Amino acid sequence: MANNRLMPEGQIIEEDMDGEDQNARELDIDDDDDSELDDMRVMRLNNPQVAMLLDAPHEPPFNLHHMLGPVAMPTRPRNKRSFLTVAKPFHIQPQMCALVANGWQAVQHLQPEMRRDYFANYLYENMNSKNYPNGEGLPHHWGQF
């Protein structure tokens, strides 16, 4: 294992635990930092816009007068609403011919499993010329009612 020792010049020397400097190696930390600082100085001198951007604060300054409190604004008069314009749910009853409406009423007292057959039989028995002469009251095309 190596023991690291920091020299006053910013150099790190690695030594063995015995204190021997045979495998000593120097790493210069300040050389990299100095070269970066020199590059930055040259860039600032050559490009004043870059210098302004680098010197600018990270966030915009706060305007303290906005933070003091809300400004009292005069209230705007509210418009009065008419009860006629307020939206209300309106349930439209689907259009049905009299035969289907009567058949629907006839199956309401039945169990749900039996309603389909009873409704079909009701329509078959009651859709005749006696109840609807010349087809009056029945739909003429699909989707009429």
Curated annotation (Swiss-Prot):
Signal peptide: none annotated. One of its GO terms (biological process) is sperm individualization. Residues 12-21 have a biased composition (Acidic residues). It comes from the Eukaryota. It holds the Pfam family SOTI. InterPro entries: Soti. Residues 1-34 are annotated as: Disordered. The keyword Iron-sulfur does not apply. Keywords: Developmental protein, Differentiation, Spermatogenesis. Belongs to the male-specific scotti family. Post-meiotically transcribed gene that has a role in late spermiogenesis; required for actin cone progression during spermatid individualization. This is Male-specific protein scotti. The gene is soti.
